[in-house]
Amino acid sequence: MEREEFVEFVERILRRIGFKTLKLNFRGGCFNLVATRSLLLLFIKALANIDKFSEEQAEDLKRLAKLFKASPILVGLRTKNYEMEDGIVYERFGIYAVTPGTLYSMFAEGEPPLIMAERGGFYVRIDGKRLKDLREKHGYSLSELANILGVSRKSLQRYEKGDSMVTLEVALRLEEVFDEALVKPINVLKAKFDEISLSSKPETTLEREVFERLERIGMEVVKVKTAPFNAITTEEEDNIELLTGIDEKKTEKTLRRAELVSQMAEIVGSEGMFVLKRARIEVVNKVPILPTRVLEEVRDADELLEIINELKEAKS
């Protein structure tokens, strides 16, 4: 299946199960689908081979997910070595990856996956507290149960504390011993990005100038490398979020990026703007284009947002 065909296939699945979707055709981007349903917001990278997903893309995807309180997910068909299986969760750089079939089961049938593919085999997470209660109820010591399972006493202690995943074989033995399900579902919507850096390091002289000016008016800037925009600009007190593009001058690529920013801003409930070194003030695809001199004259975040809203209203 070709890259574009696969993205469209995943988008059709999402729409079938009630999601509003946006497909972004931006080569090299950290995501190519945005999906919303009720209060749920997903940033999805759909690609047939999940090993083509880079660490840089993963870091950007985590930043976006953290800023927008969204869930990042990879959807794929294979790795470079093997086909992915339905019902199993894979991981790349801290982001969960599933097949289209697993995605459908999660949201259409309410069946979360239970098995995690890790180096060395398949693993599950078990209810450690329930395991300890059952062990004590049946009168097993740590050593006795560990011997039955074929694991060390220390490993069994980690299982009971919930500090370690369990091989599929051990989990099946546990359920045979106690005749009770102990496996906990994997929450694919909860990626591991608590410690992600919201860095604002600029890559160009123009980016540095724009970032510094935005920071001087009280805004925070988070650099994003693999998206249609260069940064997310925020102001927490007034809950301002701006998808911010930066270019030297207006080109066809700028216009295409502005269109994508406009579409994304609408679906995530934010605003967008482009700052160009050389440009006239205008609105393209509902996204204001501002020359850098405008930023130099702005006194605070509220005034910037006021300019953006006035330009959009004048255009409509």
Swiss-Prot record:
Q: DNA-binding residues per UniProt? A: 142-161
Q: Give the Gene3D superfamilies listed for this entry.
A: lambda repressor-like DNA-binding domains
Q: Which residues form the HTH cro/C1-type domain?
A: 131-189
Q: Which GO terms describe its molecular function?
A: DNA binding; DNA-binding transcription factor activity
Q: Which SMART domains match?
A: HTH_XRE
Keywords noted in UniProt: DNA-binding, Transcription, Transcription regulation
Q: Does the keyword DNA-binding apply?
A: yes
Keyword Heme attributed: no
Coiled-coil regions in this chain? none
CDD domains noted in UniProt: HTH_XRE
What name does UniProt use for this protein? Putative HTH-type transcriptional regulatory protein PYRAB03670
